[in-house]
């Protein structure tokens, strides 16, 4: 699979596999996991990249949601599951619990 990227609006970067849209991430995540434009990647590399992109998206969503109001762990995870996978949502929630921004009991 040939991976190419294209700058989007703001800080977005659009990723394409074999010329077809595949995912969107932000510049920071892309720079942390950079793969040169036109690189030939296998399915394993693509899946690893998607895991990192989804985790970063989950962290960003947590920050956004918690900046608006307090959430219980269950509420936040339920909200995250609307836009990211279960593993990424749980890892992001765990990270915010460790950092002291989220508590099981209020």
What are these regions (language model features)?
Residues 1-106:
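An alpha-helical, amphipathic repeat domain used for nucleic-acid recognition
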């Amino acid at each position: 699979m040939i991976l190419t990227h294209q700058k989007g609006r703001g800080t977005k970067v659009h990723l394409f596999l074999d010329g077809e849209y595949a995912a969107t991430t932000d510049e920071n995540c892309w720079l942390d996991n950079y793969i040169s434009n036109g690189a030939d990647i296998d399915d394993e590399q693509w899946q690893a990249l998607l895991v990192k992109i989804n985790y970063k998206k989950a962290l960003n969503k947590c920050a956004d949601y918690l900046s608006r109001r307090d959430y219980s762990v269950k509420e936040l995870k339920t909200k995250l599951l609307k836009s990211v996978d279960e593993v990424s949502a749980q890892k992001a929630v765990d990270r915010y619990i460790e950092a002291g921004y989220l508590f099981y009991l209020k």
